[in-house]
Amino acid sequence: MSKIIGIDLGTTNSCIALLDGDKPRVIENAEGERTTASVIAYTQDGEILVGQPAKRQAVTNPKNTLFAIKRLLGRRFEDEEVQRDIEIMPFNIVKADNGDAWVEAKGKKMAAPQVSAEVLKKMKKTAEDYLGEEVTGAVITVPAYFNDAQRQATKDAGRIAGLDVKRIINEPTAAALAYGLDKQGGERTIAVYDLGGGTFDISIIEIDEVDGEKTFEVLSTNGDTHLGGEDFDNRMINYLVGEFKKEQGIDLKSDPLAMQRVKEAAEKAKIELSSAQQTDVNLPYVTADAAGPKHMNVKVTRAKLESLVEDLVQRTLEPLKIALTDANLSITDITDVILVGGQTRMPMVQAKVTEFFGKEPRKDVNPDEAVAVGAAIQAGVLAGEVKDVLLLDVTPLSLGIETMGGVMTKLIEKNTTIPTKANQVFSTAEDNQSAVTIHVLQGERKQSSYNKSLGQFNLEGIQAGSRGTAQIDVTFDLDADGILHVSATDKATNKEQKITIQASGGLSNDDIEKMVQEAEANKEADKMFEELVTARNQADQLVHSTRKQVEELGDALPADEKAKIDTAIADVETALKGEDKAAIDNATQALMTASQALVQMAQQQAQAQHAQSSQQTNDTTGQSSTDDDVFEAEFEEVKDK
């Protein structure tokens, strides 16, 4: 069996590792570096450059040098965060025919997975050069808070790169594998704080060893898929551009070449300020006007950088609280804190994490390499090279379908261990309904419209009947990669329809963050909406059953009673068009009062039928009943569920 490699496909940098014997090893690329810049350049002579060679020519080729493409994976062009990126990226982000966010280089439009595949190709080539053989299998990591569309897009990138993606695993989980594989002892609970180039994740993971088998179980995860080192860089870029404009009166944002130089200088200054208290940004001949060339010379202190990004660091703390709450743990339950991602080298980040958890983060984990090392370990598990390791990951957000009244009915709750499977039986909402639409949603809100639509499909050819009689079995199958497969089956006809959620229906990065935060902030609104829908459904059901009883009684129902009931039904239907729960409740109560005569007549009719049936039974059996003891019993019919 050929070697399976582990790849950390990062926003800013990527890394590859594999098992060398029984030890994971990070492989150096052709330039001798252990990490590869996630930068892709399309040159004038048709060459595609990846990594440091691409970065080196970026100043002279800014429009065709692409970076931070991971931020576009599984994204729609209209997404708010994509629109923000359009304003600051030197290259063109364009709208694809299907609405996805694509990029343009040398006049050619390309999908984000297509561009990311170039980085994966370099990773693949690096491994093949080291091993001296072809490599096809890979485990690729993604942020824990990546949604279905983003995970699918990552797999697509692997496929384009010629890789068989054996597994998609979450970056914090991979880091936990790298940290905990060789740790001896009993149970420990760790917090993995992963602040990378474009995303932030926090995962609470329990590591336990029982009978020689080491288990890594993710208890909860949270995060922000639009928060990372690139955002820190942008704050520095805006500061430098602003200072230059104040001094020279020239706005560099309209000059792609100048902005590329400023970007490189900002990133360099940010890194230097992790070890120095101040640094100078010197860019001679950054631009020119009628008076001659202009030079940038700005002194930046660590304190200034911290003031620019303080709110970004603060944004990482709320997900920490939610993750602990979801795991039913307190800060004192955390044994170790692991920092992952290059941005965690910033002293301010380390200080905030230390202050939050009340303990220093571990220093024995390489934040740039731990994720790739963990991916290599998981690759070894899949290849049978690593024994006695069990990885139990979770889904970050709840999954469900839209049901009557615009409610999201959850089939799989957030933080459920994957792979997992869940099913639920639903029925039709209308009489003689021959088709249903299965609308798949992801999020935490009760109201469907506040969650993200992942896709929808129709199940047709349902056996016609009155509402509620057809039974539709909906099954959600969430695989180990966190990718969802949905099927719906009509139990009467066994007709089935399936769908695998595709990237075009995925979530945007801000959407996921907003869903969870809004769910926390809008619990009361959700409760009121749920009560409104319940009232609506009860009223609708009462109207349906009342009309049915009126039809069954026919002429036996006095005309004045029928008129009262018809008026009450009309009032309910009017109330149902509004959003006032009290009005619906009042109209429902009025209908119940108006239909009391109907109920009494139905009961009298049933009693008369019962009496007639009993008389016939007595006439038939009276002569044969002698001295034998006769026992009466009630039998309850048990129906198959």
Curated annotation (Swiss-Prot):
InterPro entries membership: ATPase_NBD, Chaperone_DnaK, Heat_shock_70_CS, HSP70_C_sf, HSP70_peptide-bd_sf, Hsp_70_fam
Gene Ontology molecular function, alphabetical: ATP binding; ATP-dependent protein folding chaperone; unfolded protein binding
Bias-annotated ranges (Acidic residues): 626-635
Keyword Membrane applies: no
Keywords, ordered alphabetically: ATP-binding, Chaperone, Nucleotide-binding, Phosphoprotein, Stress response
Induction behaviour: By stress conditions e.g. heat shock.
Matches recorded under Gene3D superfamilies: 1.20.1270.10, 3.30.420.40, Actin, Chain A, domain 4, Substrate Binding Domain Of DNAk, Chain A, domain 1
Residues with PTM Phosphothreonine: T199
PANTHER family cross-referenced by the UniProt entry: HEAT SHOCK PROTEIN 70KDA
Record's function text: Acts as a chaperone.
Protein name: Chaperone protein DnaK 2
Source organism of the structure: Photobacterium profundum (strain SS9)
